[in-house]
Amino acid sequence: AMGKKAARLGADIRLNTPVTAELIEEIKPHTVFNAIGATPIIPNILGKDQKFVVNSHDVLNGLATPEGNVVVIGGGLVGLEVCEYLAEKGCKVTVLEMMKECGADLGMARKICVQESLYMSGVVQQTEVTVKEIAEGKVIGEKAGETVEYPCDYAVMAIGSKSRDGSMIEAAARKIGAGYIKIGDAGMARRALNAVKEAYDAARTFDDPQIHGYLAKPQKVIAVTGVTGTMGQETLKNLLS
């Protein structure tokens, strides 16, 4: 719906189009919004490259479909979301967390709701576990100085995310004197609530030289990278308004 609305309002939407320095130079935008998001953190664990090891992004996007007995590595917000999702799909889920509790990054009210959901779904939580290796059919860790093993058909990496490298995009924007603004996870991986507010504010103030430090230009040609993502859509919506 957002894409159709943007097209009706005259936005030039280019799908399946990699962002290059040449493309930015061709468009000659007033401002470039970098909304290319984040990529999952993959820790350097022995066995991480095996076929039955997938990451949280691919699971939640439907690109990977674990089944059977699943071990989720990482018991933070994203890891618990993966646990709930897979439990609903009929998987038997065990989550491994290094800290003393799962969901330590959740607010108290939300944590209560999530923990209740995990309990009702039969998700097994194992805390204070440091994962050492992923072997065929099992995840090997260390707990209280002892080796522990968790059998699995699939292992899911859910450690967290890091911003994608946008240095080329920034350099291309600076080269032609365009403004450059990072929004959402492209600036720093964090929660959607904060990132959406940031995208809203950036779209409302992008041509204010006192805020963004470059001179406003009369022609408002804007380039938004990663426009199919949540942050890109929020920015586009407010630019068009």
Each model region followed by its residue ranges:
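N-terminal Rossmann-like dinucleotide/flavin-binding domain of flavoprotein oxidoreductases
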Residues: 1-29, 104-129, 137, 149
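Short hydrophobic alpha-helical segments of the AMP-binding
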Residues: 6, 86, 239
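Rossmann-like dinucleotide/flavin-binding elements
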Residues: 14-28, 35-52, 56-106, 142-154, ...
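Short, hydrophobic beta-strand segments that form beta-sheet elements in well-ordered domains
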Residues: 32-35, 241
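N-terminal Rossmann NAD(P)H-binding glycine-rich loop of SDR-like oxidoreductase domains
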Residues: 220-240
